[in-house]
């Protein structure tokens, strides 16, 4: 069974160990944490810079064997009506077990019931098909917002997705990749 708890500094070493190659790292971070390889101290410092705000909530998923995933929840605007998910990752040795979907289902439940978000958004690179399939299966829908990132000498298109409580996975059978 997967559970969600607040991130702890001691999680950083495990989380950064999941990025075995540059492409995986950039699909996760969009370069916001510097270059590959990511060091645990870099992740810790980045999160420490935000820890005294009321809009930044890193979370860690765990199972009976330990840490299994990680994601970030943050309010991008002062009115705190929209919650943004980011830095979503599952331990590569645990992929294929439905942990990504389960972790995001827990996070969506938390977002809508505890944090009272009216909408949750997430960005995903067009070339990250497994993540896109996961998000669509939960009921996320594409918006018209896209952004291009220069990564490793190429342009990567980031697609903005959103979900509201009435379209969450608990109310649908999910959606297929468009």
Show the residue positions of the predicted features.
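Glycine-rich phosphate-binding loop
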Residues: 98
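Extreme N-terminal starter segment of soluble prokaryotic enzymes
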Residues: 1-3
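C-terminal "cap" of GNAT-fold acetyltransferases
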Residues: 83, 118-121, 125-132, 137-138, ...
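Acetyl-CoA-dependent GNAT
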Residues: 6-12, 17-95, 104, 110, ...
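Short beta-strand(s) of the beta-wing in winged-helix/HTH DNA-binding folds
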Residues: 26, 141-142
